[in-house]
Amino acid sequence: MRISGIDAAKALQALAGRLPTPRRASLARLTDTDGGALDHALILWFPGPATATGEDLAELHLHGGRAVVAAVEAALAAMPGLRRAEAGEFTRRAFANGRIDLAEAEGLADLLAAETESQRVQALDHASGHVSRAVAGWQARLLALMAAAEAELNFADEDDVEVGEGVAQRVSEGMAALAGELGEWLARPAAEVIAEGLSVVIAGPPNAGKSTLINALAQRELAIVSPVAGTTRDVIETPLALDGIAMRFSDTAGLRGESADAIEMIGIDRAKAAVEGADILLWLGAPKEAPEHPRTILIAAQADRWRGDAAAEAEAAHCDLILSAATGEGMDRLHTMIVEMARTLLPREGEATLRQRQRDALAEAKGWLEVETGSREAGDLILLAERLRLAGATLDRITGRGGVEDMLDTLFGRFCIGK
């Protein structure tokens, strides 16, 4: 149990009768205001500001029984000045007190929600300050360019200020170089790709084995398998993780030209939309009928049914994979192919990614830094200095130094009470 704020010391003394040596675990008998025993617990005392929240902070390591926790909570609630923490309030106080910045707080939120290895790695990278350090480096370069521009504008006639010739050109070239680096970051996959999972769509004509395949991948019955064409009428989606990569697999209605069933036609339209939005397409059908898609795996499915059929064997030769979800043939190879294709959509090892909010700010900053070479503006230091200022203010939004109040409640509301 964690207590943070100006009354943390009073609360700990009231429960334990003393303040232990800072930052050392100590065994204590906890009592309520009437002297009644609550628990024997480990207590820790962290005087601010060098704490997680930047405030005085106390921790109680209790026995985990519900009655114990409830009794200690009741004792704390009876003390003046104390109240239950709101969701994410400890992290919000850390942000307000400068212990972490907004990008690190967002990384911590993602770390708490991480379910796959790739999500954990990305979130820990953000929470550890990778993005924040990059922003600090960009800001330092902006300040250097701004200093050069301001020196030329305000102090060019001073003997002790070295400005030299061609300052506007050097500043505009520095802006172009920085804009190029921001563009490289924007070209990376968005963080949401890892957080939300890649979309893998299973598509093909009716009775191609799509539902059998998604059931085999999920290792449970998600979709009805029937010899009757048109059984699947809607998109059936399930989250799966392959080799630590989050994915969303979708089974779709069989694609065919026309159907007398209006409901099936709605399902076909939804299937087509799913194919268009897929990151990876698994096509179970004739290769020549596969939709155009940059990342398609052509699958000759239901191999257990057509083995020995010369025509089917000839068509399968044009596919990437021969598979039977019923017998398991080709399933391991399909797993490998999906993972290999998925990795091409993910950031390289050690490469940080950006959330959409951060990408929007970075794109705006890049826009302020882009000035056409040889234009009048490229030679105007006053305009260049203003562009540099606006770019810096925009980058501040990534780490939470400006213009972010409207989204703080939403962010910290995602945290659990203990954070």
Swiss-Prot record:
One of its GO terms (molecular function) is metal ion binding. Binds 1 potassium ion per subunit. It is found in: Cytoplasm. Belongs to the TRAFAC class TrmE-Era-EngA-EngB-Septin-like GTPase superfamily. TrmE GTPase family. GO terms for biological process: tRNA methylation; tRNA wobble uridine modification. GTP binds at residues 207-212, 226-232, 251-254. Its EC number is 3.6.-.-. InterPro entries: G_TrmE, GTP-bd, GTP-bd_TrmE_N, GTPase_MnmE, MnmE_dom2, MnmE_helical, P-loop_NTPase, Small_GTP-bd. Pfam families: MMR_HSR1, MnmE_helical, TrmE_N. CDD domains: trmE (cd04164), TrmE_N (cd14858). Keywords: Cytoplasm, GTP-binding, Hydrolase, Magnesium, Metal-binding, Nucleotide-binding, Potassium, tRNA processing. This is tRNA modification GTPase MnmE. Homodimer. Heterotetramer of two MnmE and two MnmG subunits. Mg(2+) binds at S211, T232. The keyword Phosphoprotein does not apply. Coiled coil: none annotated. Exhibits a very high intrinsic GTPase hydrolysis rate. Involved in the addition of a carboxymethylaminomethyl (cmnm) group at the wobble position (U34) of certain tRNAs, forming tRNA-cmnm(5)s(2)U34. GO terms for cellular component: cytoplasm. It is an enzyme of class 3 (hydrolase).
